[in-house]
Amino acid sequence: MLKIFEKVFGSKHDKDIKKIKPLVDEINEIYATFASLSDDQLRAKSMALKSNLQEELTLIRQQNSDLSGKLENPDITISQIESINRELDELEKKYEEETAAALEKILPETFAIVKDTCRRLKGHTYQVMDHTMTWDMIPYDVQLLGGIVLHQGKVTEMATGEGKTLVSTLPAFLNALTGRGVHIVTVNDYLAQRDREWMSPVFEFHGIETGVILSGMRPEERKKEYACDITYGTNNEFGFDYLRDNMAGSPADLVQKEYYYGIVDEVDSVLIDEARTPLIISGPVPNANTSKFTEIKPWMERLVKNQQNLVAGYLAEAEKVVKEKPNDFQAALALLRAKRGQPKNTRLIKMLSQTGMAKLMQSAENEYLKDNSRRMHEVDDELYFSIDEKSNAIDLTDKGRDFLSKLSNQDSDLFLVPDVGAEIAAIESDEALDTEQKIKKKDEVYRLFSDRSEKLHNISQLLKAYSLFEKDDDYVVQNGQVMIVDEFTGRILPGRRYSDGLHQAIEAKENVKIEGETQTLATITIQNFFRLYKKLSGMTGTAETESAELFDIYKLDVVVIPTNRPIIRKDQDDYVYKTRKEKYAAIIGKIIELQKKGQPVLVGTASVDVSETLSRMLRAKKITHNVLNAKQHGREAEIVASAGQNGAVTIATNMAGRGTDIKLGEGVKELGGLYILGSERHESRRIDRQLRGRSGRQGDPGESIFYVSLEDNLMRLFGSDRVISIMDKLGHEEGDVIEHSMVTKSIERAQKKVEEQNFSIRKRLLEYDDVLNQQRDVIYKRRKGALTKKRLTADIFDLLHDYSENTVNQYAREFDVKGLEEQVLRDLSVEFRIESITFENEGVEKTAEQLYKAALEFYKRKEDVVPEEIMGQIEKYAVLNVIDQKWREHLREIDSLKEGINLRAYGQKDPLLEYKQEAYKLFVSMLGEIEHETLSLAFKLFPVTEEAREKIEQEQKKSQVQQDRLVARHEKAETAYENSGSRPEGRQEKKAENGKEPLQQPVIADKTPGRNDPCSCGSGKKYKNCCGK
């Protein structure tokens, strides 16, 4: 139906292109007039455009500056601050509107200038990544279309080889004229540096500065690169610098400018594939115990071994029963138990490829899945643990729990976690216990709860490590380290680690060194980071299939740009085989056929293991070939460059080499161009389209096909039932192949199912992070305000006003004068005296006013004796130190909340709603603590003596050592909020390059006791159980 409408009314993309085509004509008309200009005259035109643009926006910038200056006034009132902030918000909105209108006006002339600059550069030789390059690019009309779409804040889909890198120069140049900075985001450091060096002649011609952010750069280098008009870098580097800027100790430590305009190259990879992976800066957990996994590991190995024996028995039973009674339900049940116990068992997969077996097992599964899987426990109870491969979940059964409890010897109640609330209530109500005994008993309950919970968590993670994660598929082991393999590119992700102890569990499994645990100090998801940009756009060769998600999450429209020359690549229907063995044999046969012909072939694989299997088979046939996977990524550029030569055979995991075009060698066009052979379908149609897109660039000939088997993961989990049925009916023999458009469509439907599932996970992740994002926004704004102001006196006095009212209210019910006086002395070190009768007569309001005045006088006296610059430092230290400490604690509490929130679903409660409510309570509580402790610190801090200064310097050295141990991670968290809970984590990409001296810590005049210290009032109780309540 949709296609009929498109034929009548035209497609959305046709309409999009039709709207902007007149702009292209205008650009070309202006471009034609520039031919007679000298280089200096052309430069003068770009300078004039920049100057005029800046002049148009000067007035509004000045208004903004004047208003911001008023906020520095120490005597400003809260109502005045709120009024000024409202005006600033209105001004910012107006500024963005005027900037957009001004850029729209100069777009045709600016694009014409860039196009003419490219023409003038033709034949210019220069160095790119130590290779000599000759400029030979002038934007085509379709590239101008792409540039306009990017400037409009949309995603442009352009086929491979259409020159997306050149397209980005057009909107980057235009938006750089604002002086607000443009960020061009790429997928790795190599492409960031290459693209910057490759495109720099266009910008340098007009004096526009370009920079690049690379991992390993020091803060001062980063600051210099960000100061450029255009900065290239990866999403990780931009994101981590944002987080580090929000941990900075002084304005001089900030490296980034504003987030004005971002252009994301390979936008689907960055905004979709990476979207399940939050950016995290973490620090080490003190006294972390890494031996806990080695204690449990022998138990787990025995459990897994017993399960394997159990599954082998069920398979033997199924074989035996089927021989006697082909359709017996007992055989079907045995097969189902084998599948639930070890779904990737080689013998099971082979049996299911036999005629009728998969259908037999499916009949049993359908029976037990009825009524929301109500009877599935009957299947699972006979196993030690069950695996649901589709949802990546694993569940220990009662049989498994009993087995592990026996192995633990001393702990027969291993799986009984105490109900802390009930236990504590019982202790509190036990009148036979004195205070000390109660404290001791409570500590025992907490310790038992903590020990049991941790042990159960470690058992769960080790079970996943042994049953769900496979070496050379999900990860590789290199140089004694477990390294995650990117499922989309096949590349190793250096330093990226799984979270919640899963990575340590895999390290224990593989007998390598178990690294220490870390705790989150700052975090943001990719989605919420890129939402910071005032304007965002992106480009890729494959975005149309993800257009709904790009619009839903980022409000990015997708526009498909027509190719400069028609694509003539032949995309064949899939070849479907019953077993992997048959499929691999067919692939090798096809490669030999193509090599004899001289036609280059690129074989795409989904894992390191498959690429090495095919490589072994080719070596056995003495076929010369190259392998590009996570283990052999060092020669990537060289291998990709030679993949289009006559007779070349290249095996590459997924899209390794993406971002580099494969150019055809001499005579290859006549042979049919590059032949793409996919060894299996990926979960995402987009990844398959990317693989096909390696061939047929710029109108070159080419061919693509996928070889699929019913044993492939995608087919096994989501798509094989109908295809198996067809094969069984046709009586297919070994080696036979199905090739039909209906089968290809069936496979694409299976892919769509997985895509929808992954989208829901990413959307759920965003819904959870949106809660934290609003809180992060409040905290970071407050922190940045404190960081950039010279004095924070007005903020301190505002806190004092609220404190006075709240504290007086607290003691007003019983007119507890002594309690009030002691509280003020503890909190502010202020001697506040008031008679009991006065307290009663004056009431709350007047008493609060007296308290405010007394504290104010104390603070003013302090200002009289402490130099203004030092007072500014004291206030800033108080605010920043407390915010950072409390935010870290809050993140830890939020992590704990996330871990157990899904269990609320068992109580018929929506986990997300519960999470929002709990997170809000935690946030409100944290804000109260921040305000109270900030005020307390500001009053108690005084300049240091010389003796104390030496002590502080020693502490600073310790602090710097801890700072250097911070790591930036890009957490791999696709199941972070799912019941499966494996939360594959994150990226310990590099040390955090803060490189900053910590703020000088003044001496605290009156130290509040620690929560477990004896209370200073002399009661003999701990502080937390007495005055610290």
Curated annotation (Swiss-Prot):
It is a peripheral membrane protein. Zn(2+) binds at C1015, C1017, C1026, C1027. It catalyses: ATP + H2O + cellular proteinSide 1 = ADP + phosphate + cellular proteinSide 2. GO terms for cellular component: cell envelope Sec protein transport complex; cytosol; plasma membrane. SMART domains: SecA_DEAD, SecA_PP_bind. It holds the Pfam family SecA_SW. Coiled coil: none annotated. Its EC number is 7.4.2.8. Residues 966-975, 984-996 have a biased composition (Basic and acidic residues). It is an enzyme of class 7 (translocase). One of its GO terms (biological process) is protein targeting. It is found in: Cell inner membrane; Cytoplasm. The keyword Cell membrane applies. Keywords: ATP-binding, Cell inner membrane, Cell membrane, Cytoplasm, Membrane, Metal-binding, Nucleotide-binding, Protein transport, Translocase, Translocation, Transport, Zinc. Gene3D superfamilies: Helical scaffold and wing domains of SecA, P-loop containing nucleotide triphosphate hydrolases, SecA, preprotein cross-linking domain. Residues 953-1029 are annotated as: Disordered. Part of the Sec protein translocase complex. Interacts with the SecYEG preprotein conducting channel. Has a central role in coupling the hydrolysis of ATP to the transfer of proteins into and across the cell membrane, serving as an ATP-driven molecular motor driving the stepwise translocation of polypeptide chains across the membrane. Belongs to the SecA family. NCBIfam families: secA (TIGR00963). This is Protein translocase subunit SecA. It comes from Chlorobium phaeobacteroides (strain BS1). The gene is secA.
